[in-house]
């Protein structure tokens, strides 16, 4: 491993005097217990960017117990009424949390939306936001999850997606780790993260297996991206590793760096979803213990 501060291979780029902002942040919630934390996290981002904050509550798949599958007539109506009542109660609690966050952070533009998990409008809502925040999936496959929503948004929305960890804690994004391999996806992720990078105190660029990818990285891997990031005002360091499991190295380095956010491109060996979410992307998608911004 080697480490260096932002190299100076060329004239440094002058630091920008004004910070770029996100215009609209959209956060998805459902009936999971970490809704308060993900709403808080989105609220912090909205406050710092002066952004409009939209919360979309995705109504969960009704959980049907074995006895309920045999319900008929009055019994089935009672089951439906009970589930509707539970859903209304959950949504009311989430909305109260959302409205409290909007008030505490002085967010002047906000909106609450409620959609069925199967509605085609769920994904459409994400297409026009500057940043989308959603809980990352768990291997447990909870029935309350909109099926494959997080993966689908990363794959096809064309928007930067922050995957918030289950049971995560909301905090301001001040330390950012970038998984950098100089691919189109990584370039897109860094560009999408500029409003966050511009507010960071420290940024680290992690490059793995750079010797095999010199054609993409140039003479000194990480030098040019570090120079451009330094212009945003943050302290930038570059870490170079000759080899290793990229996904696990990203996650372990995020812990070592005390990162508040990991930024990376989502990529794979095929456009098929099963293969796209293999390798590095799949490791991070299901195992990250910190928020991860993915772009593709």
Label each residue range with its predicted role.
Residues 76-92:
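A short acidic, glycine-rich active-site loop
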Residues 161, 286-296:
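Short, flexible loop segments at boundaries between secondary-structure elements
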Residues 1-17, 60, 93-132, 231-262, ...:
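Structural beta-alpha unit
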Residues 27, 133-135, 178, 264:
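Redox-cofactor binding/interface segments in oxidoreductases and associated redox assembly factors
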Residues 18, 125-126, 153, 169, ...:
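Structural alpha-helical scaffold elements that stabilize or flank donor/cofactor-binding regions
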Residues 105-166:
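Hydrophobic alpha-helical segments and helix pairs
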Residues 134-152, 173, 265-287:
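Glycine-rich, Arg-bearing micro-motifs that act as flexible, cationic patches
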Residues 2-78, 156-159, 170-240:
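Small/aliphatic-rich secondary-structure junction motif
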